[in-house]
Amino acid sequence: MARRSTKTPPPDDSYEEKILDIDVVDEMQGSFLEYAYSVIYSRALPDARDGLKPVHRRIVYQMNEMGLRPDRGYVKCARVVGEVMGKLHPHGDASIYDALVRLAQPFSMRLPLVDGHGNFGSLGNDDPPAAMRYTECRMADATSLMTESIDEDTVDFTPNYDGQEQEPDVLPAAYPNLLVNGSSGIAVGMATNMPPHNLGEVIAAARHLIRYPGADLDTLMKYVPGPDLPTGGRIVGLTGIRDAYESGRGTFKIRATVSVEDVTARRKGLVVTELPFTVGPEKVISKIKDLVNAKKLQGIADVKDLTDRSHGLRLVIEIKNGFVPEAVLEQLYKLTPMEESFGINNVALVDGQPLTLGLKELLEVYLDHRFNVVRRRSEFRRSKKRDRLHLVEGLLVALLDIDEVIRLIRSSDNSAQAKERLIEHFSLSEIQTQYILDTPLRRLTRFDRIELESERDRLNGEIDELTGILDSDAELRKLVSGELAAVAKKFGTDRRTVLLESAGTPAATVSLQVADDPCRVLLSSTGLLARTANGDPFGEAEDAKRTKHDLIVSAVPATARGEIGAVTSSGRLLRLSVIDLPQLPETASAPNLSGGAPIAEFLSSLEPDEAVICLTTLDESSPGLAIGTKQGVVKRVVPDYPSNKEELEVITLKDGDRIVGAVELRTGEEDLVFITDDAQLLRYQASQVRPQGRAAGGMTGIKLTEGAKVISFTAVDPAVDAVVFTVAGSRGTLDDSVQTTAKLTPFDQYPRKGRATGGVRCQRFLKGEDCLSLAWAGALPARASQKNGTPAELPEIDPRRDGSGVSLAKTVSVVAGPV
């Protein structure tokens, strides 16, 4: 195949070559200035009057032109984007849609201008918005205020990019949108970054400035104390805010809103419900994990994002035991986006020029714009009403002699002649005459003179009112102030962002961890274990006996980083670390242990048939521990607990014997009390029992009859009001759910006896009763409960030492006194 020949075409002599020499410096300066001005004026900076950039203004205006009112249905965002791009903003659909999405995001705008339907993204852009073909939108309720009266010659219009459409230079803006919603943008050689504010506060400041034009900044800041961010949070330090309100530039810090809560039965956690402006939870979680992995952040066990649409933001940061949550929080503020700085730079366009404005200047520019809008609106309305009044007056003249009007019209050869004759005969203007001629005869004859006169009077009144506004600056300012007040009443909301003068006293560093503060460790009747927030004694609230799990059977003083012992029924003492125990909230009444954790979680070595009898301190200066067994053995343990052992024997038990009671002596002057199942009670002073070492087996505490056993052992302070509670039953049905009678007797009714004696009778058995199924002795007030922690009532006090009992309304399984 032959190659195709390629010939160079001859030069075209019809074009004359012309080369211009241009200085590159001049060309770069000129082109760059044009580009910079285009970016500043047409893209990046908002207008100080309506607070909108061109793309936002075009979106709002075009939605208004499309009739997408708040009471209409939603339309696809793609349709709105197409209309805006085709008619007003030829810069690509992506940039327009991004701008539209921002106007619909409640976490970006303090008062959203677009009502979005669908996925419009999430805080921090962790979840991007859906494509425009899936989402829908319409104007928000407040958006109608931005375009209100735009068709009444309130603002100037200019041709669009191709000259086929008209677009407004600015929107009427019935509220100070720039301050309310803020703005951000990067231009050439300058940028703007303005935080949102509370609508009600901004309007209050604007109204004050209307009334007192010479108001100073301090006065205005009484109304606008600081930004009010859509995402809430806490602004720390107000000095930077005042600088920004004075000069247009300043910096402040935003902190997340965090509370310390019990996130599990054994651990505290930081619950984040509000994050700094523009910060999303994924960003915070990612940063925390990076810091933990790099070992730059200590004390965090886990981070969970429990955010949902129903409950809003909820970020749970679980704190390890032994770390101060407040101290960990300080580190989070320092190292993560949970604290961010916001640099205010109030740059906006004023008369086409970028200026840096303070709070007062921003309000003044807006108010000047609003005065101009209302003035032009009033002139437009007055003109329209004057035109209508002119027509009404013509109709009234015609109605005075309607028959003559009809005769003149019918007798005329054409409309021009009729027009001339009506003008000549009735002294009407051409406009009035033309309106009469254009009105069908059937309508002309139906006009009611009274209605027309009423309309004339109403129009005259409205014209006078509008003239008064236009002629009086005071009336104009009063009208604008009233309209602003109506906007605030309808759309105003409570402040979301808390303003703090300072961050307060910094928490201790994490390295210090939990301070070794005093506390109390509590054991409930249902086996729940917890520690209090401090070592103060708690009150004896009556409602405690109605609260489940509040029956405390053992309590010991401790410190947050200390240890205590748990005495078991098999004679062992097991060490417990106090820091691992769940901490109860501070309360002035009796504590509720529903926030505690089962003691078995902390004592993994407990046998299935082994129970914790009491808690004890490991302080060697205490009087020691008193122990009583089922076989009647008593022992006072010398407080000598080696710190290198997690498990100790506090008594050597005989075969078949078990501890039924153990109590830490407070003074050593208490009375020890044994109660047996055959209703014998023995009381004697603790001083009759010689303290013994841990390995000793104790001594005889009570002389038991054949077949009897001890069911209760305790120590009672003889100086306090105390009682003895006993419940009778039958040996054939020892289940405490089958109880017959019970008795509550003052403790002082039982005399002291010697150690190892048989004691005295504490309850007389009735028919069918042959043993005690439950017994307890202790100080008042005494409270009772069932096995599951449900409160139960005790009988009235019976002063008889050996009297019989009375029936119970509810089964009693546990009794306890104050601790």
Can you describe what each PLM-predicted range is?
Residues 1-248, 310, 314-316, 549:
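Catalytic phosphate-handling regions of large nucleic-acid enzymes and associated NTPases
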Residues 2-6, 15-17, 24, 183-184, ...:
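C-terminal interaction appendages of subunits in large macromolecular complexes
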